[in-house]
């Protein structure tokens, strides 16, 4: 039985991205620099990140019966992601409208879920049960219904699958879901929204991490942008510095981290090694414009890490 695969339960979107600087204020129109229309969604991004990082990857999600269906499914399949568990539903595919500041690389995003909210708990349970002998790690985010997230946690707990929860966009989840979470990976703002603790330094990050662990998560991994990440677990607290790079687009950094983290854990890496590869993947991603086009391959991550020694 080969369980080196990763299953990703999450959103599949068409990303409509505008680049320019400065970003417009309310009521203001500005002239931009560039535009892209590509596959996106936190689920799809993490699936591509995982498969590029070297893991057999299975996408579980939903798209609509519109012109963006072929764009999204073709892009996933072209990367080698297994799309047999992607449902095609009536209506529109999910859309993300992204604006990226061309100078800082920072962004803001508005998501219209569409088909992503038509994914059901039963759909997901059926797919995960079928995949349980091929995967050991499951990634999930909060761009699908919370009832789906809860069912994913239940199935992972029952089937002894390692679940990585990316709680974005941040919103409360059912208390009973936490016991199925192996790693919860919020950024500082998401950690603050969920815990009520303003994460500003190591001490506050540790307090926020303990909040997640007290509710049943095994490990909390709080990402801090250019300050790296802090991992809080049963063996204590470990701080990982970020790799210095010049960002041009930070949109997919968190998804690159999650995908590389999941792929590394599925191949048997330690949490420490997997976290370092996740940070490297995130660092490489912010140096390239676009969401899925920016996600690095395993060889690029290897070379980047080798250059840091």
For the regions a protein language model found, what residue spans apply to each?
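Conserved beta-alpha-beta core of the PfkB/ribokinase-like small-molecule kinase fold
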Residues: 107, 124, 136-207, 227-229
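Short beta-strand scaffold segments in enzyme catalytic cores
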Residues: 48, 95-99, 108, 228-232
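Glycine-rich phosphate/adenosyl-contacting loop at the front of the ribokinase-like
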Residues: 1-62, 67-71, 77-78, 246-248
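Conserved phosphate-binding/catalytic region of the ribokinase-like
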Residues: 1-6, 172-177, 202-309
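Alpha-helix C-terminal capping segments
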Residues: 48-56, 100, 263-268
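Conserved phosphate-binding/catalytic loop of the ribokinase/pfkB sugar-kinase fold
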Residues: 88, 98-137, 142
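A glycine-rich helix N-cap at a beta->alpha junction
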Residues: 75-90
